[in-house]
Structures are given as C-alpha cells and as structure tokens.
Amino acid sequence: MIRVNLRPIRVAIAVLSVAICLFLIQLTARIGFSRLLTTYALTANSIPAADEAVHLSPSDPEAHRARATVLNRLGMHADAAMSFEAATRLRDRDDYLWLELGNTREELSDTQGALAALDQAVRWAPYYAHTHWQRGNLLLRMGRTAESFAELRQAAAANRTYLPNLIDLAWAISRENVQTAKRLIGIKDDKDRLALVRFLANKGKGGEVIDQLRLLSAPLSKKDHDELVRLLFAAKDFKNAYELWVPSMYTQSTGAVFNRSFEDSTILNEPGFGGWVRSASQNKVKLAIDVNEKLEGAKSLQISFEGSLDPGVPLLSQTVLVEPAKTYPLSFGVKTKDLITGAPLIMTVYDAVSNQLLGKSENLPSGTTSWTKLQFDFTTLATSRAAVIRLQRSNCDSSPCPIFGTMWLDEVSLVHGSIDF
C-alpha cells in the first residue's frame, strides 16, 4: 500500500483559504469604506471624497453615480457625464442611470446624445411610465411635437397619474384650443374625457366643460357632477357653474334667492349655489329654524349670539346670478330680542368676482323689536355676473366687541325682475 502524505495539501488549502478570507475582508472593507465616502460626498458635495470612493471601488456603479451627482451639483456637467457613462458601462440595464446621463447631456446642449441615453432608458424599462415621460419631454423641447406626445401618451397609459400633466402640456402647446388639446391627449374613453373636463373646470372654462360633458357615453355621476360645479364655482365661472348645477325643476334666472324664507332647514357649509352658506369660522353663533316666529310662510331663521362675531367674516352668505349694470332692490325682514352689540349688524352685497361692495343696508335694529321690513338698492358692475348677499357686522371701534341676544331673519328677496325659489 502506497501512503500519500496529505499534510502539505491540507496546509496549502488552509493557506489558500486564509488568503481568500483576507482578500474578501480587504475587499469588503474597501467597498464598505467606499460606500461611506460616497455617502459623505453626497452630503458634503465633496469631489475628493467622491474621487476616493471611485478609487477604492472602481467597479461599483454607485460610486461613479455619486461622483456624477456631486459634479452636476457643482455645475461640472462634462465630468459628470463621463462618470455617468462609466456607471452605465458597469450596469447597463439601469434605466435610472440612463435617464440621469440623458439629463446631464442635455445640460451640455447635447440633445442627440441625451436622446440616445433616453432611448436606452426606454429600451430597458419599456413598460414603465417614467422613461416614456422623460423621453417625451425631451422630444418636446427638441420641437418634435408629434413624437413627443406619442411618448407622453404611452406614459399616461402606463400610469394614469401622468394624465393631468399630459393635459396641462397639451393645453399649453395647443394655445388653449380644446380640439387641438384633445388630439394631442388622445382621448380614448370617458375617464380620459372627464380628466380633461376637470382640468377645464379648474381653468374656469365652463362653456368647454359643458360641451365636453355632452360627449360622454354614460351619465355623469352625482359625485363628478358636484365636483365640477365646485371647481367652476371656485374658478368664479358662476354662469356656467349655475347652468351645470341648476335642478331641472327650476327655471334659471338672474337675481334668484334660494330658500329666501328658510322653509328648507338646510344651511350649507361650503360656498355654492342652492341656499345660504354659513362661514366655518363663525361657529360660535347658534342657528336654528324657528316655526313659531316668522314674517311670512311657516318658518324663519333664528340667530343666537353669545358674545362673539368676527366683523371681517360674514355670518351668512348666498351667491346669486345677476345681470351687469343693473339696479336690484334687496328686501328682508328682521326681528330682535335683547340684542346688544358693540357694532351693528348689516346686510351687504358684493360683486362675486372683484369683491367690490355694491350696496349695504342701514344698521339692523338692536334691543327688542317686532318684525321690521328693510330694503336697499344695489347696482351691479358692467362686468358683474354674480353677486354675494351677506349678513355681517360693521367694523368695531373697540376690542373685544361683544354681541349678545337673538335675531330672526326671514323673506330675503330680490324684489324686481327676479324669480325666487
């Protein structure tokens, strides 16, 4: 039997294992220290730290990326582009690296090089929205509008959160032409059209909103309907907001005061059509529908004051449509009980767009009084389309400016050339 001495082999294996372990420890230490330097370089915008990170770990694409990021921050775009190129050679399927390289090349006015980089980003992430979006924006800046919007539509198809931005771009490029914008957006279904309608409503383009709503294949939901009315109202397109809102049972009319005698107990909490709106900040005043006290009809509004009412904010308001350059008489009834106030209550009317005062009543009575009918005239502006009726206080001469007691309000009406609901 031949006996083989295995000891030298075992020793060699052990030495090799130790060497490999030492190498791996050293490599791990170098990579770890490189990553530490990378973090510091990004935090401090330190080029020396970024250079050393690349020196310690030249095969780490993150080190090259960090160096490029620091160089870009310092305006050294040419050097940054070279670092991004090195990173893409090490990790060529990273779409974000290609996007960063493309953006850097564009900073150098190398739009063709930027496009080549973004082509690679799309190649490696063809089903993601962000690559198509970036490429589409670059093509748009290059003046290649048709190609650009093809890419942008792909982005919006992949991720609908891009659709509002697509609509915004199309609106700007089309110079606010709805038909051109629709073509650029590529309206495919009711969801796309509703997104366009919301955008138009935000812009106060009520006529275009109503035109587009007529093209929907399915009835508009109540939620969407109410949202569009709110958007048009907020954009101060009162005429079209009203046209969209007005219930079919009502005949549209200027000067229409809704719920003028408070027969409907609903008080709205946010601005809109259809009744009286209570200002959110005036929540210390108690409002109640009273069936015992009324000027006419079956009910009135009882208002109980317990010490606080901000003169700068109306307690109640209602927006009504009006005709331009026209005089309207506004009448209303009030009754008071033990009403004590440092500044009198008044009824006012303001232009809904400019917030210009159009008219105001005499001071409302204080103390204890029976029902009193008051009236004042206001004249709308040449540009007026809507006005806001407000119940508020006059300015106080002192602070605090208390108010205590009870007032009733009833029969608020525009009495000439109007129809009240």
Give the residues covered by each predicted segment.
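Extracellular and organelle-lumenal recognition/adhesion modules and their flexible linkers in secreted
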Residues: P8-I31, R35, T161, N165, ...
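A structural motif in tetratricopeptide-repeat
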Residues: L56-D60, L74, R91, A125-Y128, ...
